[in-house]
Amino acid sequence: MKTPALSRRSLLKTAAAAGAAASVPTLASSATLEPAAETGHIRNFDMIEAFYREYPKKLAAVRGHLGRPLTLAEKILYTHLYHPEEMREFKRGADYVELRPDRAGTHDIGGPMAIIQFLSSGKDRIALPAAIVCDHLVMANAGAIPDLKVADKSNYETYDFLARAAKRYGFDFWPAGAGICHQVFLENYNFPGGMMLVTDSHTPTAGGLGMLAIGVGGADLVDGLMGMEWELKMPKLIGVKLTGRLQGWASPKDVILKLTGILSTKGGTNAIIEFFGEGTESLSATGKATICNMGAETGATTSIFPFDAAMERYLVSTGRQAVVDLARGVAKDLKADPEVVADPAKYYDRVVEIDLSTLEPHINGPFSPDAAMPISTVAAKAKEKGFPQKLEVALIGSCTNSSYEDITRAASVAKEMIDKGIEVKTPIMVVPGSVRIFQTLERDGLLDVFRKLNATVLATACGPCIGQWHRTTGDMTRPNSIIESFNRNFAGRNDGSTKTNAFLASPEIVMAMAAEGDITFNPLAGTLRSRTGQNVKLAEPKGEELPKQGFVKEVAGCVLPTYEKIDMAVSPTNERIQLLSPFKPWDGKDFVALPLLIKVKGKCTTDHISPGGKWLPYRGNIDRISDNLLERGINAFNGQAGKVWNTETKAYDTPAKVARYYKNHHVASVIVGDDNYGEGSSREHAAMEPRYLDVAVVLAKSLARIHESNLKKQGILALTFADPADYDKIREKDRISVLGLSEIAPNKTVVIELTHEDGSKERFEARHSYNAKQLAWWRAGRPSTGWLLRKRLSSPAPARPNWKDLRQKSPAAQRRSVPAAVVQSFPCFLDDGGFSDGSLKAL
């Protein structure tokens, strides 16, 4: 159904763009555009008010059960238990907990598949406040206005589908041009002490406002949207003590660049990074958000800062004084207990200390965000490693570094370059984080500073950070270098070229490096040549935490739901969106003699498994996007990407074509991964695509948290080698069997049998991390099937527990009773917390 056009004049009308913007059509809705929060409208304020009213009671119950000092992360986790009557000391890194988030969110590439899965539930509306932000599908090319015009036309089908779903089921809808989702959430939805789920790995950005926000796949999000329990392995806790105060060129970005180098891309797996210490109070809220955002690059579940005055200032500046007033009432419990801060090693699983006063700016890369280099070492490292020295593009922005403060610090460097007659040698692109920031920067004359250096100001969208970039500078077929204030620099991520060496830095360092155009330049020590031939040294950057005149008022952007019974039909010719058919359930038999699809060597991120760029528009069409499966995965047997052996045709082809051949001939297959397989983004397509192409098993040395969860939710058996050395036993033409599946159980290994080409066999053990409920998901074949079974088997939901009554009751006395027939058939399907309303259809 085509919805009426909505003028984006209010989104893009600025001093420089009003004439060009005119009226850009979008497919959002005919509903009223809501102004931004500074006008006094706080979305879902009743929910926030109830949260702060109940928080002390819930925390008292937690303290009564645990009887010990608590970290901030523990306070939020335990007060969000779905079944507080089952409260106990959950073992970190081992036990699973069921949680009840406060908010949810998604975007235009994670949203379609999540909503497609939600449609199968039969629910009439979502069960918790949620928002859809269209930020991923805008292709960066000519600039904000022309790029948004192209996006509206080329992404019509996706935007229309999301807008209809939002209007019908209850999502707030932010059309393209409104901002990058994490900045939109920070400005409008995040609040201290709350919990949020979003289908994006950089969701932890909200930790800058003291919110526990976690990136998930679409199936996990649907759990929350349906009011069901959302399950998480109880995270370990990494405490990061910050002391001192940042000096000179050092920025919040350098805190996380250094920390990522310390922890590596897997050091935070199944852990929450919690910052504490007096150094936290010297950082702005958006600076904290930058640090939390990129904590995802360590594999961390999320990151969080304690509530403080900087958060108050930010909330007030974005129209949320009422939230500040509520948070102040529980402020002492929006941070770790004093005993924890005094003796952190006793309460955190690992403690890292960073002295902000001595922190040096960093440049991390290339090809991995944990390749950390203090800026004083970059020149020597570049020459040692043979990095291409010329910087061909400088990119400022992304969800990591697009706040008002970020852009003002970069603008101060740019202004000095203009004033001192320094010519820029590298093309610059600037991405403000939201329309509010865009218009405020425009009002304050700061975007014109960049334009004077011939910078391209892009739309408030993800753009080059996720590969949505029509790059026209330099020759990408040869090794080349770019520098960016983004969060990830995996091969091929930004421009699709695996030859591009991408380096991560703060916005001000990126701006300074653009002047010399050389990765070996150190702006702290080096000089630049002015037009008059003088050697000029750049002064330290200066920025503004928040705009002195406040943010621009009356910024429109949000379309509110109307709950109309809009038709959600999808045309069979729609290339962007197609509804799902249920995957087949497990047949009860062992997997026997399955062919190896690929044995991946080295780093294999979700960008390798399901690349972005040109494929992003097809995230809502599982058949179409499955053509990119493991396009960038390196085959351990030939060292090449996109070339694997087909055991049936006896020829090499792409992983997608080989998997599709097997599927068409009713043959399942196996993927073997290296260490930290599936690190990076939360994209569930990296699990859904192999499931769709009948991959039955993923066996790896280790699995990244979100990807492992997505594999489980999509019905793929996710295994790890009991002995990582067994990875070397697997040969290219092996047949792989997984034995003992009829007896698979929590904490019990399975047997892997290899049948080599010569007929010889080898056996070894593999581990899994499934609990009883997750095994039932796997047996059922996929989560939507699980939801339907759950409705069919569940008993009426119990009344929601009274937290106050739980303080002295033992956990054993609070266990739920489950009908015996249900337990016998599906031990994991306990009473369902609210699905006795007849809204789910039977199988």
Each predicted region: which residue ranges?
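Long, structured ligand/cofactor-binding scaffold of large enzymes
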Residues: 55, 60-233, 626-671, 676
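Phosphate/diphosphate-binding loops
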Residues: 329-340, 441-527, 702-703, 714-749
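Accessory "access/gating" subregions that flank catalytic or transport cores
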Residues: 163, 175, 180-194, 298-424, ...
